[in-house]
């Protein structure tokens, strides 16, 4: 068929959460008819929880998201984006106000891609205010891609054999007409459609008010407020910053590179850290690897090899 699960709910004006949940599903071989933009899971609105799903073997994205305050956790995504380019296993983009989303404790590996390639987590066209915490990325072309966004947090992740682990650009500053139309027209209209200077947006996302002066000055929007901290990069190219972005705009701290983190069994893709791992010395927090993926419940009474 085409896409797997589509979900919307909640109120973006008031940031009222729907509290819908997509949990413990095995989604595979989707996008069979339409090869692009038919993800395993598509969600919109406010406050959904996407947990403990196994999603694999799709030609395009596994999860596409829009909206606010979604929690994406304990999912296992692999062999995604096999027939497309400029795509992410997880994808969102092009709205300053879609913030407060959290991706934590997911395992993403073996993303494919043609042409421009693929990303593990793709924050496209200035997607902002997203937390990427405690995930494991292995064999991803680009593991985390921040395309001009602001106030994103990349923390406590493990990157193995990715090229690069993190890439950040400043496309919001590009003077070319195509980017000015996207930033100054499309994204400005979406920003103005939300009353971001009054609650709940002004209190929940105070950084939004810092964007308005840049529009007044007509100088483009820089990728400020991004944080890359306490990550492990092993066997990977580490960090690429370019296309109008500068390292001075980004907080980069306490990351471990080019040192063996002492995985339990790298060859078996068991990326739990041994108790004597040097990563703990700079404050790295244990990732609950044993909780990632499907689990046994009243609907799933056994886990087959294909469920892991």
Where are these regions (language model features)?
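Active-site and glycan-interaction determinants of carbohydrate-active enzymes
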Residues: 273-301
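Glycine- and acidic/polar-rich repeat regions and solenoidal domains
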Residues: 1-270, 288, 299
């Amino acid at each position: 068929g085409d896409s797997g699960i589509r979900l919307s709910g909640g109120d973006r004006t008031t940031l009222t959460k729907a509290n819908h949940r997509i949990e413990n599903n095995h989604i595979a071989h989707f996008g069979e008819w339409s090869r692009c933009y038919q993800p395993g899971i598509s969600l919109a609105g406010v406050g959904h929880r996407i947990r403990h799903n196994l999603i694999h073997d799709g030609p395009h994205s596994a999860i596409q998201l829009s909206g606010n305050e979604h929690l994406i956790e304990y999912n296992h995504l692999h062999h995604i984006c096999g027939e497309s380019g400029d795509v992410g296993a997880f994808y969102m983009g092009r709205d300053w106000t879609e913030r407060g989303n959290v991706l934590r404790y997911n395992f993403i590996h073996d993303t494919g891609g043609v042409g421009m390639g693929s990303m593990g987590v793709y924050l496209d066209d200035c997607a902002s205010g997203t937390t990427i915490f405690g995930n494991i990325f292995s064999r991803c072309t680009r593991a985390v891609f921040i395309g001009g966004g602001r106030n994103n947090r990349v923390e406590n992740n493990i990157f193995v054999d990715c090229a690069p682990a993190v890439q950040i650009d400043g496309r919001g500053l590009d003077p070319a007409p195509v980017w000015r139309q996207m930033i100054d027209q499309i994204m400005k209209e979406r920003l103005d459609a939300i009353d971001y200077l009054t609650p709940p947006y002004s209190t929940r996302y105070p950084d939004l008010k810092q964007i308005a002066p840049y529009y007044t000055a007509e100088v483009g929007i820089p990728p400020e407020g991004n944080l890359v901290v306490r990550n492990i990069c092993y066997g990977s190219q580490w960090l690429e910053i370019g296309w109008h972005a500068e390292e001075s705009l980004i907080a980069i701290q306490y990351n471990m590179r080019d040192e063996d983190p002492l995985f339990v069994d790298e060859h078996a893709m068991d990326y739990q850290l041994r108790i004597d791992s040097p990563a703990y010395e700079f404050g790295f927090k244990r990732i609950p690897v044993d909780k990632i993926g499907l689990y046994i419940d009243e609907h799933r009474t056994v886990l087959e090899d294909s469920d892991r």
